């Protein structure tokens, strides 16, 4: 059967922003630069970001992903993923005589620092997040004696604190904004003196991607979210789409996972992607839809993003030293080829 022609009634609403956030971009580039700088293999503790395509691409270039620090042979380089790690992991790396590169997203590092500061002031810290997620494990490890995990409003009833006047909430950076505030409201009902973090812990990229989906959800009968099933922020986009009024929303890693029956009775399809997703995967989804008559694409713009994070300091240091060495070999700064 040949490709369908575009129908005036069929269209795609394409979310903007979508895909890579600054923290993911930094982490992926860090692995690529480390492979260039040190050669393969470069070990990465946990998936650098939660995206199957990205991980497979980096594996082909020589990255080796491990779940435990002890899996890295002594004397090698290990990079910590964008989700962050607990202090005990740094200690494990030191015992294993491993050189470390910390690719933790700076916005996650901010939450870690808040946890340490409030723990030092002897606050009970209520961490809103999903049990077992790597980011939550890392943040909890910063102050294990002070942090309690609150996995949604239904967890609030069982929360106990030592002093109701010294309680603060923090959150995983990739949650649904609405769901988090529902949990915060429930916590405030129980602990009226609950303190909020100095600034919102849910990252700008998570909020912007959810806002774009909210704007398209009322018009799109179907929303396709490109992202992996272990990606918290991608799964939240599916939930947000349904809450915004979309009849159906699905998470796919690749275009070939889309079921044609999803298009039955659909004239408007919303398309977005999680913060760990390269745009090439979205382009493949758009091509798939175009071949089925959904050729008209409208951008739904919720925000501008211009944030860029610098590479991990360990990598910047070694790149600077290499550049200085090359200059010295060529007879001094700025004189080569003069």
Swiss-Prot record:
Keywords: 4Fe-4S, Iron, Iron-sulfur, Isoprene biosynthesis, Metal-binding, Oxidoreductase. Dimethylallyl diphosphate binds at residues 50, 83, 133, 231-233, 276. Binds 1 [4Fe-4S] cluster per subunit. [4Fe-4S] cluster binds at residues 21, 105, 203. CDD domains: lytB_ispH. Its cofactor is [4Fe-4S] cluster. GO terms for biological process: dimethylallyl diphosphate biosynthetic process; isopentenyl diphosphate biosynthetic process, methylerythritol 4-phosphate pathway; terpenoid biosynthetic process. This is 4-hydroxy-3-methylbut-2-enyl diphosphate reductase. It comes from Streptomyces coelicolor (strain ATCC BAA-471 / A3(2) / M145). The gene is ispH.
